[in-house]
């Protein structure tokens, strides 16, 4: 039997600009019955390793945020230690390539942002 999975792929905690601690956010996601969640704090690896907490999968992630735009990295530790300036699109590309090599899935946030110079090619 096929099943739909409920989850959220873009969550922030008090480690960046969210209003809940990681523990509280995990608890709230479990309360509403999510199957998975990805904490994507800005430029910070809040979840050090993906894991199950009861029946809910907590996936490691991070939102790379700087002048050129915002990119989510899911499922692998971002290979840099903040603070790390990402001043150019080339800086992002290098970090994204390194993240992919580490096994991450990449998601471009806000693709129609007028001041984010990513090219959708």
Model region roles, listed by residue range:
Residues 1-121:
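A metal-dependent hydrolase metal-coordination microenvironment
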């Amino acid at each position: 039997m096929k099943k739909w999975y409920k989850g959220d792929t873009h969550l922030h905690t008090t480690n960046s600009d969210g209003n809940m601690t990681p523990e509280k956010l995990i608890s709230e996601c479990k309360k509403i019955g999510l199957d998975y969640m990805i904490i994507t704090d800005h430029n910070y690896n809040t979840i050090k390793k993906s894991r199950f907490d009861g029946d809910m999968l907590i996936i490691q992630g991070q939102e790379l945020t700087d002048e050129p735009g915002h990119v989510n990295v899911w499922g692998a530790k971002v290979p840099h230690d903040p603070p790390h300036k990402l001043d150019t699109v080339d800086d992002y590309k290098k970090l994204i390539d390194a993240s992919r090599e580490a096994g991450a899935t990449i998601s471009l946030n806000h693709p129609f942002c007028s001041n984010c110079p990513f090219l959708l090619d």
